[in-house]
Amino acid sequence: PRNSPASRGGTTPHTPRNRLGDGSDRFLVGLAVLTLLSDLAADRPVLFLVDDAHWLDPASADALVFAARRLGAEGVAMVFAAREEFDARGLPELPLDGLEDGAAAALLAERASDLAVPVRNRIIEESAGNPLALLELPAALDPGERTGKAPPPAALPVTGRVLAAFGARVERLPERPRLALAVAAAEGTGELGTVLRAAHSLGATAGDLDAAARAGLLRITGAHVAFRHPLVRAAAYQRMPLTTRLSVHTALAEATDGDRRALHRAAASPAPDEDVAADLERAAAAARGRSAPATASSLYEHAARLSPSRDDGTRRLIRAAQSAITGGRTERAAALAERAAEHARDAGPLAELAMVRATAEFERGAPAGTARYLADSAVPIAATDPGLALTLLVMAAGNAWSAGEDGEVRRVAGLAAEIGAAAVGTCVTRAAGETASVAAALVGLGRIAAGDVASGVPLLRGVVAASRTDPFGSLIARLFVLAPALLLGEDEAAAELAAADAALGRQRGLIGALPTTLQVVAQTQVAAGLHRDAAATLAEAGELARETGQRHREGRLAAIAARIAAVEGDEGRCREHAAAAGRSVAEAAAAGACALGLLHLGLGRHDEALRVLDEAASGPARHTAAVVFASADLAEAAVHAGAPHRAEAACERLTEWAAAIDRPWASAVALRCRALLSPGEEAFAAAMRLHEQGGRPFERARTELLYGEWLRRARRRSDARVPLRSALAAFERLGAVPWAGRARAELRATGETAPAPSGGEDPLDRLTPQELQIVRLAASGASNRDIAAQLFLSHRTVEYHLYKAYPKLGVASRAELARFA
């Protein structure tokens, strides 16, 4: 990576930077860095030092920090030295204070022994213990100032003083070496050939550049020029008169091409210039095409600044904001959108801005109100751009559903019914089906939010089926379909669609979408009873959500983790995750509350379970999804708490829902609830027949447990043992400790000596979440490099985890992993 020319205070130019991430998505570049470091460490350990990391451009910083977070067994150590503002979340930090006065005095005595005592004391005071300042401030003083015979320079902040010190050394250079130094400062990437070509066109030579090197201001190594310190570069650039600066950038524009040419042309343009702005816009579009959103955003912003037309400038600012969102820079996108909003007047640009601003607010964890904003922005463009209007409505529906704003969901459904047909009419053949399905699904979601499950569910089922038959081309549409699949209990469809989207996201480096798809993967794994795999998926999704600033997604992931902990009876973990979910969007908060209710139910705290679940289903913080998914637990808690009348409504809701979605496991659970309120066993028997069709092993085991309890109370002890044994085996496989305890107690009550808790640990339980992911992929036949690419790790880390996993699993070779697929 190269140092960025930008310094504090906006005093340096908008010049090209050699961005490590310019050619690809920042996370894929980070993976490439990790792989490179891993390969370098194959023969011996590597120490990677980054001094002044705060001077790195954002793309380079992202890639390096991404790699650092994933270091494990590579034999690589990375150390960043930076100011506090450097964002290195997830890495251990060691704050460094300035040198104490005694150490500072010793350093000055060694390096600047001729300083008068008052001068030395002032330097110690003004340096604030900064070693760079202690070394450079004396070098900027003339002999009179060093001895105290001349008045000292005016006091400045440390950075300003050091910058001034370097500036004084720049000023001492003759004119042509100073010009050559300025060209190197403006060039920004350190390419010697480019610097020399531009310098030559201005009358400077390689010898002039050598003179700057002899002055200790830069180094020339091979074909590369490097400044002694970023502040030297800033000083050299800032000391250029305006006319020189414009000439330097003009010369550099002639000596370069692509993005750098466009940026140098921009820096050489003191006034708006449409030709230059258009050049920048073309470069930005090319950057978007090669998945470099950060670069594209910067180029679009520069293009906006140089646009003579306000409308063109606004359009380019909107593109800059959109690219910032794509690159995961939420705060930057919000700031750009605010600037664009000051000048946007037409409905189309305002609608595009609405998408950016709503996305930014949602990613910040504040979705409330964004749905109305999106829907309001869709209405004015419905006639002129129904496709964009429908996209806004899809986003609005998702945000409203997450925020628990049922009224907005219904409003969006009404708008979708009006706009959908027009949107279909503007599509080519293939997209028409996708658009029609999505519009219908929005209508269906609105009906469900209004309580009309029977007519809403078929519309949702249609969009899921359409997506499975012919995967949608739009990323927004693909992600939208995942929610209906889960809502309908179509676990196989949800798993299939989410796995395909996750694979596509890994292949294309769409890291921002991965937390969403991995969340759905985890939910389907929980439904299938694969808690270990779900925990590993959640760990990866959580890390990616944090890296991309998706606060709301972290809350949703926490709700799933709370559910797993509830099933397993881990109260501390469940409460921790439920609390995190409670701080997120309404949907996550409600799911976290349902997990707490399940925890209480499993631990036999029926009154508390009833209170928590009743609040989730009908309290002020209710959510439509919780009304359905809490019903079975609420009914069971009510019956056990001696309040069967409070189970009636829950049973009715669940029965209606199960009939609509027509999934065997859901119908079985509805029958189980009905059985709790019925004197006979017909409902239990019917439920067991439906469970035979598969799906949701935890729910089947719960039905078996309740059926066994009923049979035992009916004095049919021998009959009771069959479902109770099956329930116990399932609960033990799931790690559902409190539920297994109940099944064991019921078996003992039938007169059977129930087996003690199996002490036999599943070998997979010995693995860490990451080891489990790697073992599963290796068992499926993936190579180490394939696994590394999928999980954004180095292949050496994959090798290390497999090496650690083999003895834990009791295997000696990769071939033996097949049984763990």
Regions from the PLM with identified roles:
Residues 63-95:
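Sensor-1/coupling segment of RecA-like P-loop NTPase cores
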Residues 103-308, 312, 419, 602, ...:
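Short secondary-structure boundary elements
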Residues 117, 142, 203-204, 293, ...:
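Internal alpha-solenoid helical repeat scaffolds
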Residues 207-208, 219-227, 243-332, 336, ...:
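Extended alpha-helical scaffolding segments used for macromolecular assembly and cargo binding
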Residues 748, 755-821:
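Helix-turn-helix DNA-binding segment
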